[in-house]
Amino acid sequence: MVFRSGEGHSLQWPGPEGGTGCTGPQSMLRATLLLVSLLWGARGTPSASLSPALGHPMPLTRGRYLSIGDGSVMEFEFPEESEGIIVITSQYPGQGNGTGPSPMLRVTSLDPEVLAIKNVSSIALGSGGSFVVSIRSGLPGIAPLHIQLTDPREAPPRLIEERRDFCIKVSPAEDTPITLGTDLVHFSENPILYLLLPLIFVNKCSFGCKVELEVLKGLLQNPQPMLLGLLGQFLVMPFYAFLMAKVFMLPKALALGLIITCSSPGGGGSYLFSLLLGGDVTLAISMTFISTVAATGFLPLSSAIYSRLLSIHETLHVPVSKILGTLLFIAIPIAAGVVIKSKLPKFSQLLLHVIKPFSFVLLLGGLFLAYRMGVFILAGVRLPIVLVGFTVPLVGLLVGYGLATCLKLPVAQRRTVSIEVGVQNSLLALAMLQLSLRRLQADYASQAPFLVALSGTSEMLALVIGHFIYSSVCAVP
């Protein structure tokens, strides 16, 4: 049975190692709640999106002692940002006879960001007993419970029963506009964003007009730079994100945001940085085009694999179809630009001239939206994800340059491969998260791509300044 406490208040229960319980009105209230729960059972909402074990009523099998309510429901709904209790009934014989230490219950939430366990206390009742678990919900999602009933009379304590089939579904509030003041609404509802979308589409089409078909044909004959870029972007960097998520024990939503960010194709003005740092610009444009097209297959695959390895799929639905749709929004106009340049070269030149004045508008609009995003996304940001976000571009640059050096590519191509792996399209990852998840989850997960974008831009600008200073002092081309 799951109860929600009154808004702004929580029912305080002693933990298993604490005192013996409350007295007075609180004790009477607790006993009343317990009796009601035992008589009426629990109200649960099976979910069609879960596995059969969670989504359908399952009878209490013989030999099981623990249950919530009548044992027929495995999933229970609870509102976000609330406090309450769960009543777990135990039919283990001897719990209520008072002849010795009673069995102990340990309850663990497998996603503490969604549901936190505050404490557990026991109540003896007849031949059995019950446990009252105090909980606090956080972000919307599904938090599986790991429940263990142990006998403390033996050394070490004997495991009587273990349950992993119960879960708490924390339901989000209605997605009403979130305000941080009288005039500040969520950036996703800003009309400037919708005004910029057509310009982004045309800008990507004009980028496709810059792709040289001869360079693409040359990459097919000598594919080493292209293969190294794909290897770094879609194999090494996602694996690095997986390692960082494990090392820093990132919450599930943040881990998903980091995986998608590190699985994103090249972008973010990488060809511009190649120009400023003495790289091969035509190669950079071609590699960005190839990685964007390849991402339509590799990014959803990478996200699905690492979501499984990190057990993200247990609490968050990884929206592969929406991820693919966002990628196609970028890949299709770029591919259209390549076709336009091949079939209508004069029109492609016109398109390139027309888009130039609007590039400044896109830049200003992007800076404005970045500020508005930061107000929401970086609220409550923590040190671990800041450190990880700072290292991602640096690791990408080192991985790309190291791979290119191993194959002894020319210096210009080494720099290009390094930049293509290190400067990923973090804003594309942010867009995928915002379009795929609920608002609170999306803003939380978007901390990863937002910080990577900030770090990458700052680090690349520092490299450009350092390169100019070094080139002017040492006369290096």
From Swiss-Prot:
What topology does it adopt in the membrane? Multi-pass membrane protein
GO MF term list: bile acid:sodium symporter activity
Offer one example of a GO biological process linked to this entry: bile acid and bile salt transport
Concerning Pfam families, the annotation shows: NTCP5_P3_N, SBF
> What's the family?
Belongs to the bile acid:sodium symporter (BASS) (TC 2.A.28) family.
Q: Does the keyword Transport apply?
A: yes
Stretches assigned to coiled coil: none
Give the main localization category: membrane
Disulfide bonds, paired cysteine numbers: none
**What protein is this chain from?**
P3 protein
Function, please?
The ubiquitous expression and the conservation of the sequence in distant animal species suggest that the gene codes for a protein with housekeeping functions.
Gene Ontology annotations for the cellular component aspect, listed alphabetically:
membrane
Identify the stretch(es) annotated as Disordered. 1-21
Q: Where in the cell is it found?
A: Membrane
Alphabetical keyword list: Membrane, Symport, Transmembrane, Transmembrane helix, Transport
Q: Transmembrane stretches, by residue range? A: 225-245, 253-273, 281-301, 320-340, 361-381, 383-403, 417-437, 450-470
Q: Does the keyword Glycoprotein apply?
A: no
The gene that this protein is the product of is SLC10A3
